[in-house]
Amino acid sequence: MDKKVTRLRRAVPTRRKITQLGVHRLSVFRSNQHIYANIISPEGDRVVVSASTLEAEVRTQLAGQSGAGGNAAAAALIGKRVAEKAKAAGIELVAFDRSGFRYHGRVKALADAAREAGLKF
């Protein structure tokens, strides 16, 4: 098995449990250069809120930094942005879906920043 298949296999039990809970899901995806965060509806059929390091506003804030989209500072900024957008959409309670990634580094930085900005999970 390759790394992607293994990671997705690790994510299955978490996603199954979140589906049973019936709450919005904060899903995280990280690539080598960028990080993405989506809040998905309880039915799992639509993205309610999203934020990533590809957004123009985020790119201007990160301009001049080395590894601009792929570091913990960028992940923390995305966590804060997704939490602010979620609160504006009336969402406070979510379940955290790390998508099979270890809860460490950029994933942890995003989660901590989202909690500090007011999301509950």
From Swiss-Prot:
Task of the protein: This is one of the proteins that bind and probably mediate the attachment of the 5S RNA into the large ribosomal subunit, where it forms part of the central protuberance.
Protein name per UniProt: Large ribosomal subunit protein uL18
One GO term (biological process): translation
Gene name of the record: rplR
GO MF terms, alphabetically ordered: 5S rRNA binding; structural constituent of ribosome
Family: Belongs to the universal ribosomal protein uL18 family.
Keywords tagged on the record: Ribonucleoprotein, Ribosomal protein, RNA-binding, rRNA-binding
UniProt cross-references to SUPFAM superfamilies, sorted A to Z: Translational machinery components
Alphabetized Pfam families for the sequence: Ribosomal_L18p
GO annotation, cellular component aspect: cytosolic large ribosomal subunit
Family annotation (PANTHER family): 39S RIBOSOMAL PROTEIN L18, MITOCHONDRIAL (PTHR12899), LARGE RIBOSOMAL SUBUNIT PROTEIN UL18M (PTHR12899:SF3)
Residues annotated as signal peptide: none
CDD domains attached to this UniProt entry: Ribosomal_L18_L5e
